[in-house]
Amino acid sequence: MSIYPPLGDKGANELGLTILCSLGDFDTLITGDMDAKTETKLVETYDLPDIEVLLVGHHGSKYSTGTTLLESVTPEAGVISVGDNSYGHPTEEALLRLTDAGMTVYRTDMQGNILITVD
């Protein structure tokens, strides 16, 4: 497991940790609530691997999980942790970015608990 320090410069959403969990050739990336600008700093600062699973940023906000991140780490699947909310998360814009990147998308509001197993 690798834990990266905050790279944002303002707001609580930009000051969270990034976590890369690796088991053999299987990698999962958790970016928290950072926006696309901070994600760009992340991929410019660290040599991140291609990943299998991305915990989609900020519950599928249109401001997170940007194209730069998706093109850099090329996730196969994305998990969106989301429930009933007044923000409209996940947004159609974010969902379109994920599917355009070729990802399989899983959502806790539709599938409930999501279990990922590694051989």
Predicted regions and their residues:
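Core dinuclear metal-dependent hydrolase active-site scaffold
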Residues: M1-V53, M110-D119
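Cap/insert and terminal regions of metallo-dependent hydrolase folds
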Residues: K41-N113
